[in-house]
Design a protein with these regions (language model features):
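Active-site pocket-lining segments that scaffold enzyme catalytic pockets across diverse folds
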Residues: 19-55
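Short, highly selective alpha-helical patches that border small-molecule cofactor pockets
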Residues: 42, 46, 96, 100, ...
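Thiamine diphosphate
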Residues: 57, 64-161, 181, 183, 190-342
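Single conserved hydrophobic/aromatic residue that forms the stacking wall/gate
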Residues: 1-8, 13
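General beta-strand structural signal in soluble alpha/beta enzymes
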Residues: 59-60, 89, 112-113, 139-141, ...
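Short coil/turn connectors at secondary-structure junctions
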Residues: 52-56, 81-85, 106-110, 133-138, ...
Length: 342
C-alpha cells in the first residue's frame, strides 16, 4: 500500500481505469427502490469504491458518522497506523481541505474531505485553490438545505450553493436520488483535473422514475412533455426534483404540457454542446420555473426575465423539515402556482 501511494500519477491512472471498469457495472448503479437520504447512498457508494481503489483516502471534520464518510475495514490513519485510510481531521475545516489538496498534489492518492454544507464557508479558501490548481479533490458536503430542520438557521445553508457554483472549474453536484448520487461519485472519482462537491441531503428522498446516468451531462430531461416544445419547463435540483415531478402531474391534468429538467451540476451542463443544451432547454420555451430550497442566485441564466422562482429568499428557521418547506413555500402547490402565473 505504501508503494501504491508513492508511485504517483502512473498508479492513479491504473486505479482510474480499474475504477471506471467497476463503476460501469450494473451493481454500482443498482439501488433499492425506497426513499433514502443522498448522504446515506453516498456512504454506500464510497465503501464500494474503496474496494476497488485502495488508494482512496480521506475523512471528515469530526462529522464522519453524520456525513457517512467512514470507510469500513479501512483502518484509521495515525502515527501508529500509516496504512489506515480514514483520517480524523478534527473541527478544523480549512486545514482539512488544505491536507486534501496536499495529498492530491503529491500523487498516488485519491482523496476526499467532508463536513456539513453550511460549514463550507470555512473550506472556501482551500476549495478555491483546488479549482485553481485543477486538483480532483472530492468535497462531500451534507445537510444541504432547510431540510436540516431543528438545528435552525445557523446550520441551514442558503447562499453556499451559489458560492460554490460561482467558482470556475469546480463541479458542484446536488443529486436528487441514488442514481444521480452514483453519477456524481462516478464523475468525482474518474475525472483528472476538476474538484467536485457532492451536496447531499440529510432527509430521505424518493427514487425518481427517469433519473439516469444522463446526470453525468450535468442537466437532462428527467420527465418529458408530450410535445416537442413544452408549454413550460420546471428546472430543479436535489430534493426539489420530486416536487417538480409532482407539479408536472398536476399541471398535465389541467392541460398544461410540462417538461421537468433535473440540473444536478450547472458547470458540467454548460460544457455540453449547444445542440444538447437546446434539446434540453429549447430557447422557444420561455415559461420556466426554477425550484431549489436555497438562494436563487445563478438561476437567471436558465429562467430568464420571463421566468419564476420557487426558492429561498431569507435565512431558515428551527422546526421539523416538512414544516420549514411549507413555511418558506418550497412546495408542490407553489410550483404549480408559479407555472400558472407565467
Amino acid at each position: 500500500e505504501m508503494q501504491r501511494s508513492l508511485v504517483g500519477s502512473e498508479m492513479c491512472i491504473r486505479d482510474r481505469n480499474l475504477a471506471e471498469k467497476v463503476l460501469d457495472t450494473e451493481e454500482f448503479w443498482a439501488f433499492d427502490n425506497k426513499p433514502e437520504a443522498t448522504r446515506s447512498v453516498s456512504g454506500k457508494i464510497l465503501n464500494k469504491a474503496k474496494k476497488v481503489m485502495p488508494n482512496l483516502m480521506g475523512g471528515a471534520a469530526d462529522l464522519a458518522p453524520s456525513t457517512k464518510t467512514y470507510m469500513e475495514g479501512a483502518g484509521d490513519f495515525s502515527a501508529e497506523n500509516y496504512a489506515g485510510s480514514n483520517m480524523h481531521f478534527g473541527v478544523r475545516e480549512i486545514a482539512m481541505a488544505a491536507i486534501g489538496n496536499g495529498m492530491m498534489l503529491h500523487g498516488g492518492l485519491r482523496s476526499f474531505v467532508s463536513t456539513f454544507f453550511v460549514f463550507s464557508d470555512y473550506v472556501k479558501p482551500m476549495a478555491r485553490l483546488s479549482a485553481l490548481m485543477k486538483l480532483p479533490l472530492t468535497y462531500v458536503l451534507t445537510h444541504d438545505s432547510i431540510g436540516v430542520g431543528e438545528d435552525g438557521p445557523t446550520h441551514e445553508p442558503i447562499e453556499q450553493l451559489a458560492m460554490f457554483r460561482s467558482m470556475p472549474g469546480f463541479a458542484v453536484y446536488r443529486p436528487c436520488d441514488a442514481t444521480e448520487t452514483a453519477a456524481a461519485w462516478y464523475y468525482a472519482l474518474t475525472n483528472q483535473d476538476t474538484p467536485t462537491a457532492l451536496v447531499l441531503s440529510r432527509q430521505n428522498l424518493p427514487q425518481i422514475d427517469g433519473s439516469s446516468k444522463e446526470a453525468l451531462k450535468g442537466g437532462y430531461v428527467i420527465a418529458d412533455s408530450t410535445k416537442e416544445i413544452p408549454d413550460a419547463i420546471i428546472i430543479a435540483s436535489g430534493s426539489e426534483v420530486s416536487l417538480a415531478v409532482e407539479a408536472k402531474e398536476i399541471l398535465e391534468k389541467e392541460g398544461t404540457d410540462v417538461r421537468v429538467v433535473s440540473m444536478p451540476c450547472m458547470d458540467i451542463f454548460e460544457q455540453q454542446s449547444e445542440e444538447y443544451k437546446e434539446a434540453v432547454l429549447p430557447k422557444s420555451c420561455r415559461k420556466r420555473v426554477a425550484v431549489e430550497a436555497l438562494s436563487d442566485f445563478g438561476w437567471g441564466r436558465y429562467v430568464g426575465l420571463d421566468g419564476a422562482y420557487v426558492t429561498m429568499h431569507s435565512f431558515g428557521a428551527s422546526a421539523p423539515a416538512d414544516k420549514l418547506f411549507k413555511k418558506f413555500g418550497i412546495t408542490t402547490e407553489n410550483v404549480v402556482k408559479a407555472v400558472r402565473s407565467l
